[in-house]
């Protein structure tokens, strides 16, 4: 690792929805992708294979719970799961609700936009997201 500060060690990385000491789930403020969440490991680890098998399972349980909650509450056409870490080498997963008319569909959200006239979606009810995550994970 470098001596560069880690933004996910130094800040929550979004609006905190759920936390258990092992990982946290945050809602990211992204006007193009309403409901985009991150599942962030609490300690600084770079890769999934740096975790013990039981820890991998525990982290993915949080990722899958986040996907299920977003599907139930937001009814997206698709949900993308991504763990890149090229910019922030701190293990985290993006859980991204997608709609056929979003700016980048069907490409990844980091690609060039495929349309300029994508409709804005209302912000999700953060309290409903948080409560649904607690029901699934606590």
Q: What is each stretch, according to the model?
A:
Residues 1-138:
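HIT superfamily nucleotide-processing domains
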